[in-house]
Amino acid sequence: MENPNPILNRRSFLQITGAAAAGMTAAPLFAAPKTETLAMSGGTKVVTLPEAEQRAVFRWPRYGPAEKEAVCAALDSTEIYAPVKALEREWKAYLGVPFVKNHFNGTSALASMYFALDLPAGSEILVPSQTFFATIVPMRLFGLVPIFVDSNPRTRCFDLEDARRKLTPATRVLVPMHPGGMPCDMDQINEFAKDKGLIVVEDAAHAHGASLKGKKMGAWGDNAIFSYQASKPLPSLEGGMGVYQKRETFERATVFGHYDAEAELSPESPYRYEETGLGLKFRMHPLAAALCRAQLKGLDQRNADTRRRVRQLNERLLQLPGLSEPPVRPDAERVYYPNNHLHLDEAKAGFSRRAMLKALTAEGLKATAGHYLQQHKLRIYSEAKWWHHAPVVPPGDLPGCAQLNKTSFGLPLFYQDAPELMEQYVKAFEKVWASKADLAAL
């Protein structure tokens, strides 16, 4: 029998619905199938693929013979730090930037970065509240003051309009973070920063390989950091990299956490303490660097494969009333970390996110509520004893962050082709949507 609801491609769908103009992609083209008893009400669950096979699909990180060979070669080599220097060269070429420096994680790269900025104590830094604490907490070591900025409730990205409202004469830096691999509007952010005389530090810890206007994330700001932690798109188990457009910033960041041959400082440099650095050792582990180099060779292809699988799934799910995904600019290419982030409009769906997640989980899906911490609500920012200058902590929720925490949920990323499992995921969603009456009361 011919399908009365053929799957539309994304462009055709957007032309029909006008969803792009609304800033969200959603598809009301759904005819409910015959209702089946939900698994949570005693019915048979839809997702039946054995758990071991599901784990194989969703497993991350994924290391194969090339990675194992690279690590073993590093173990056998007498040039212990050769993989570290090689990774720096390759990452610099990949981004097209003048300076990079390895670190043992993204947090140490950020700490070095804040030192390298050489700002007077009390300087304010505009940071997203909805981020990992490492974006913010290292500021306290240098007397810097975080100013918490809201997130765009559609994309999770840095809310530039809120940043404009919070600008003061003490503002020196803004730190846009590319959440889940979604590129921020760096062209607009850079224009704002240039107009106001601000430094831009990209937190690209999630955005390895993402781009805007053909330019990689991490190459847009005055400076940037990356994390290579095991869950990231470029996983070395642990590691990080700082990116710098100016030699002086590069040298200050280097001397803060590196010494001896790693420092690479000229005799004329005011930061020429090659033998000692400034007392810290933030060097990346050479085996992690070897692993990262092997992973870098396949980064773009892995990202492309993940995008393709997300599209295969989402183009079907978005036909269900109330479901949408974060909109991506036509001139941007996002990556995905750590999940496939979606939104539920409870009014259009006819049931709550809580009821949906309960029903989907019972059907065997691995779906989670997208509740992201608002950093300004954590205790460390309100206890003045840890800060030279107390953070400016807004009362209550930031509205964009609150909206995200109300509507967001995540599905696991398919890291290998699994048509049977993907079909079961789609059927589980369709089954739940067809049982709206049962869910409305929950």
What are these regions (language model features)?
Residues I80-E124, P138-R140, F148, K215:
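Phosphate-binding glycine-rich loop
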Residues E2-A21:
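N-terminal secretory signal peptides and thylakoid transit peptides that target proteins
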Residues D260-Y271, E315-L317, M356-F409, D438-L442:
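Conserved PLP cofactor-binding pocket of PLP-dependent enzymes
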